[in-house]
Amino acid sequence: MQIGIETATEQPLAAVFERVRQRDIGTRVRPNLDQVYAFLKEHPDLRFPGAHNVLLYRHKDDPRTDGRMHVEYAVQVRRAFARTGDVFASATPAGRIATATHVGPYERLGDTHGDVQRWCGANGHRVAGIDWEIYGDWTDDPTRLETTVCYLLA
């Protein structure tokens, strides 16, 4: 796996937010993205060809979270929009990022996150507390799933 530094531009997202324990994130993806896709079905002007699912994590040291993570379950969209129910406009941040492409089952994404975090520490890069995953096109072969892991740098 290759880890590198890139400059990211802001990418608008349609998202649903939830505080969830890390071990439960996988079971919450489908119900939350179903809400986003139902919204996008009613707002087709926001969609664009090749848009991907994104999970965005905002890490906050807040004792009230009780070990739960701030997770935004999202889909890339053309532009910001007015909030409708639980679906709101969000965005991946612009700036310098450390990034790597994970190839393989989603259950192993934690390994790639760990690799990027260790690489950042070993190379003098501080993470800013926001990271995200961009899910590539679906395939039935879990060994060929591609997910881009990004960490905003401080």
Give the ranges of each region predicted by the language model.
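A solvent-exposed interaction/effector surface
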Residues: M1-A154
